[in-house]
């Protein structure tokens, strides 16, 4: 007797998801292209078991955050807008200042904008680890180097 073919949609179970750790060297990579690939892997869209409402993604460690590239005139024109929710609490930071002081924020902000803005998106975002410089504390997870074109 042969096995019958099932046409039911597969739905991943959280306990069955296998997580892999990846490391990305951001040196010389364009910010937006890198962020979209990171968001895809965090979400799990690179896996055949992808299920939209389940966290099927992998962990990402990004190093050399201060060496990411911005195309065009974004290094002079791009700004980050924050507000403290107090009167006069508007703060506008230029991207070149943010890269100098907190380079991790530039990559985190770009990736966060590409993830769903709900509970699942916050859970996915916690799997992103960004570091300035080449050292990171996740060597014990033996991350696989990921190449982005």
Swiss-Prot record:
Coiled-coil annotation: which residues?
none
Alphabetical keyword list: Ribonucleoprotein, Ribosomal protein
What SUPFAM superfamilies does UniProt report for this protein, alphabetically?
Answer: Ribosomal protein L13
The record, for Gene3D superfamilies, names: Ribosomal protein L13
What does this gene product do? This protein is one of the early assembly proteins of the 50S ribosomal subunit, although it is not seen to bind rRNA by itself. It is important during the early stages of 50S assembly.
The UniProt family comment states: Belongs to the universal ribosomal protein uL13 family.
* Cited PANTHER family: LARGE RIBOSOMAL SUBUNIT PROTEIN UL13M, RIBOSOMAL PROTEIN L13
Recorded protein name is Large ribosomal subunit protein uL13
Origin species? Chlorobium chlorochromatii (strain CaD3)
Upper lineage is: Bacteria, Pseudomonadati, Chlorobiota, Chlorobiia, Chlorobiales
């Amino acid at each position: 007797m042969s096995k019958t073919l099932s046409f039911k949609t597969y739905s991943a179970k959280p306990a069955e998801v296998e997580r892999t750790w990846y490391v990305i060297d951001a040196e010389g990579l364009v910010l937006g292209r890198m962020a979209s690939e990171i968001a895809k892997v965090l979400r799990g869209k690179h896996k055949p078991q992808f299920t939209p409402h389940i966290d099927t993604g992998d962990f990402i460690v990004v190093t050399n955050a201060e060496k990411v590239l911005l195309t065009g005139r974004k290094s002079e024109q791009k700004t980050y807008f924050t507000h403290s929710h107090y009167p006069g609490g508007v703060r506008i930071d230029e991207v070149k200042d943010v890269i100098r002081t907190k380079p991790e924020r530039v990559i985190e902000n770009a990736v966060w904008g590409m993830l769903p803005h709900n509970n699942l998106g916050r859970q996915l975002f916690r799997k992103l680890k960004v570091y300035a410089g080449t050292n990171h504390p996740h060597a014990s997870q033996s991350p696989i180097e990921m190449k982005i074109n």
